[in-house]
């Protein structure tokens, strides 16, 4: 018997239940979506795949789903039910794999109608309903059926055409839920299959809800949006759209999910466990999931996002850091730390890929156990608290200089300015949704860029015009043996950005290009750091201040405005820097869910998980606000006590917190997750030895530079 797929394309020959050698020109149509092989499925597939070309193999894998009909789940006592079961399985469980093709814009959206005359050995998809005219025309007989499809579409008044720019934001799990129907149950074994599938769905939803990703639930309005609202996304200005993706990345700092739950205020949502009273057919879940930016960010946007994450206040500390380390030593070490940082970021992504998890802490948990996750999260908290404290000191010193130069109020005590920042930061710390920080942070990035341009202009003017290219007095060209450890900490402080590496790589449309993008970002940041630091140090020599802005002409209106705007920028960026630390600490005090045991009249007990959200309980909300206020006060206090020695404060944060986070933990994770498995536990091979050397070098550097920064200088 010659089996044909309905489009006139030869699939193979079957006689007496045995599969003969298929034709070398065998092609599987793109429109066919599911195939059920009747007899000897494994042998048939193995035999056929061995004779196919790579192109045919890719096409067959891409367009078909194979189901083993010899499985006990598909055996019935009566053969007449066989075709009905096959059609039911195909229609209800196999045809959702291509739904996501809508977003690609060049795939058809198939709609398969079962036919009673379908062969038991091969069921071909027919009656393809596609919005893509090219797909119809490229198929066999497409020129004949093209006008028929158009006529049917035109006569259907209820049919809505999906615009090509509209993305399919409906979650995949929702597709499966909606596919359950009476036609899928009205066949032998239908209830059993539906119960098994429903059980798996509920387990999947329970696991997702119990994890940190549960916090991205949104209201029902997301699927009720019209096509025009989806098209409006493309009209958002490039910089704004790019920065919103930057906020998404910060909401998943180090791979953790720090977005608060988007539960409506009026909801009383619970997640119920299963017992013997659970219904076989549950009601469809109407809870919609907020579409994430995962897998959609272009390479250019990733470059800008990473570059913005590396450029902040650290670059303004580098001219003074060059004075601490010496010019040539500082330039060479800055280039070394750029290469070192790139390698550690790269092996962290490799460790993530080998472990199959998307969180810095979860990688440590999987490879070493809970203790590793604890110290990773602790280091993240210390780093973000240190960054926030440095930002507060920076803001206070620049506001102090601005008020003195413009309003001539004298040098205000830093304690007043610290109290002023506390009053601002406490309400901002109450923000749960990170997207509400978009406008302040967008302005902050604009002011930072403008400030860097002003710094380059004024330092270049002083060096090349005022000093006629002659370096200022006090420049140390070699190594400053007395203060070089302060440079190490400050340089690492400037290069620290490991918290955004994992979420940025996850959000890429083409993650295989991440190493190249990361290399370009590190190279660009290194060139920018060396240029600004060298210009500033040569222009002011030994008189260079901890923050280079304080060396600029204080009577110049542009300098005064930059001091004001840069201070505002850093002040508006501080809540974003503090956000991950607050969420990590808060998650330790408040678990995501609270177990509730519900007893029924028949003495059975059901376990329910109630979200521990402030939107459901005002006491929890204000208790969280109280803890956030305490965290802000602690950070401000740390900043106040470290304000007298800002360069030492920054160096200690870089040495004590950033070195283990950037240079020790990634090497440890890569050693256990990649190097040892690849070499079968042989430590003397190159990769394990390299990871081990990096670990001990990082530990020695952390201990020595931290000690020298605190006690030795």
UniProtKB/Swiss-Prot annotation:
- Segment Disordered: which positions? 1-33, 99-121, 200-233
Q: Which residues carry this modification: Phosphoserine?
A: 88, 130, 165
**Biased composition, Low complexity: where in the chain?**
221-231
GO CC annotation, single: fungal-type vacuole
Work out whether the entry's keyword set contains Transmembrane helix: yes
Provide Vacuolar-side residue ranges. 1-242, 323-326, 395-410, 460-483, 537-561, 643-648, 712-713
Ranges of compositional bias, category Polar residues: 21-33
The record's function comment reads:
Involved in amino acid efflux from the vacuole to the cytoplasm. Capable of transporting large neutral amino acids including tyrosine, glutamine, asparagine, isoleucine and leucine.
Q: What is this protein called?
A: Vacuolar amino acid transporter 4
- Organism, scientific name: Saccharomyces cerevisiae (strain ATCC 204508 / S288c)
């Amino acid at each position: 018997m010659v089996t044909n797929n309905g489009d006139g394309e030869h699939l193979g020959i079957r006689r007496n239940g045995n599969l003969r050698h298929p034709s070398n020109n065998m092609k599987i149509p793109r429109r066919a979506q599911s195939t059920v092989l009747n007899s000897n499925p494994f042998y048939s597939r193995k035999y056929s795949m061995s004779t196919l070309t790579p192109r045919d193999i890719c096409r067959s894998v891409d367009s078909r789903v194979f189901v083993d009909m010899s499985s006990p789940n598909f055996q019935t006592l009566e053969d007449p039910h066989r075709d009905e079961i096959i059609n039911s399985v195909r229609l209800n469980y196999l045809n959702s794999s291509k739904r996501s093709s809508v977003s690609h814009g060049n795939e058809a959206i198939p709609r398969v109608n079962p036919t009673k005359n379908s062969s038991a050995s091969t069921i071909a998809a027919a009656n393809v309903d596609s919005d893509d005219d090219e797909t119809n025309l490229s198929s066999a007989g497409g020129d004949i059926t093209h006008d028929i499809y158009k006529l049917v579409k035109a006569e259907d008044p209820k049919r809505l055409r999906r615009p090509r720019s509209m993305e399919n934001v409906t979650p995949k799990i929702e597709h499966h839920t909606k596919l359950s129907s009476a036609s899928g149950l009205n066949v032998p074994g239908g209830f059993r299959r539906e119960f098994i599938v429903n059980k798996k769905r509920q387990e999947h939803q329970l696991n997702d809800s119990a994890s940190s990703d549960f916090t991205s639930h949104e209201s029902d309005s997301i699927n009720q949006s019209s096509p025009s609202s989806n098209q409006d996304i493309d009209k958002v200005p490039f910089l704004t759209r790019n920065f919103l993706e930057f906020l998404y990345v910060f909401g998943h700092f180090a791979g953790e999910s720090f977005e608060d739950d988007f539960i409506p205020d009026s909801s009383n949502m619970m997640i119920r466990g299963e017992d013997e009273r659970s219904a076989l057919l549950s009601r469809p879940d109407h809870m919609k999931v907020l579409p994430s930016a995962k897998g959609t960010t272009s390479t250019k946007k990733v470059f800008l996002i990473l570059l913005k994450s590396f450029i902040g206040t650290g670059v303004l500390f580098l001219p003074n850091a060059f004075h601490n380390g010496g010019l040539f030593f500082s330039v060479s070490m800055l280039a070394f730390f750029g290469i070192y940082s790139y390698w550690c970021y790269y092996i962290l992504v490799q460790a993530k890929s080998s472990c199959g998890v998307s969180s810095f802490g979860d990688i440590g948990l999987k490879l070493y156990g809970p203790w590793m996750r604890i110290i990773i999260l602790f280091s993240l908290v210390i780093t973000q608290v240190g960054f926030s404290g440095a930002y507060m000191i920076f803001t206070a010193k620049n506001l102090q200089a601005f008020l003195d130069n413009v309003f001539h109020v004298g040098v205000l005590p830093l304690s007043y300015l610290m109290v002023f920042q506390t009053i601002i930061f406490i309400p901002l710390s109450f923000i749960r949704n990170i997207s509400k920080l978009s406008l302040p942070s967008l302005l902050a990035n604009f002011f930072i860029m403008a400030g860097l341009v002003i710094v380059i202009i004024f330092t270049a003017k002083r060096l090349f015009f005022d000093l006629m290219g002659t370096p200022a007095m006090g420049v140390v060209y070699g190594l400053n043996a007395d203060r070089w450890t302060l440079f190490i900490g400050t340089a690492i402080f400037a290069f620290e950005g490991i918290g955004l590496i994992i979420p940025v790589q996850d959000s890429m449309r083409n993650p295989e290009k991440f190493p190249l993008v990361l290399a370009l970002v590190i190279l660009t940041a290194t060139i920018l750091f060396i240029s600004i630091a060298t210009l500033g140090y040569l222009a002011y020599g030994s008189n260079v201040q901890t923050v280079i802005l304080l060396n600029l002409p204080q009577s110049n209106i542009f300098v005064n405005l930059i001091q004001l705007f840069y201070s505002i920028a850093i002040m508006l960026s501080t809540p974003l820097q503090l956000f991950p630390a607050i969420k990590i600490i808060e998650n330790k005090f408040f678990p995501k869910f609270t177990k509730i045991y519900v007893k029924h009249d028949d003495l059975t007990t059901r376990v329910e998980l109630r979200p521990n959200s402030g939107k459901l309980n005002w006491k929890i909300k204000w208790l969280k606000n109280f803890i956030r206020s305490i965290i802000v006060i602690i950070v401000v206090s740390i900043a106040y006590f470290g304000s007298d020695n800002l360069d030492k404060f920054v160096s200690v944060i870089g040495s004590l917190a950033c070195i283990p986070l950037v240079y020790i933990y990634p090497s440890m994770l890569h050693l256990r997750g990649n190097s040892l498995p690849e070499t079968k536990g042989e430590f003397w091979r190159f990769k394990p030895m390299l990871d081990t050397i990096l670990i001990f070098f990082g530990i020695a550097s952390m201990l020595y530079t931290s000690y020298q920064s605190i006690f030795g200088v």
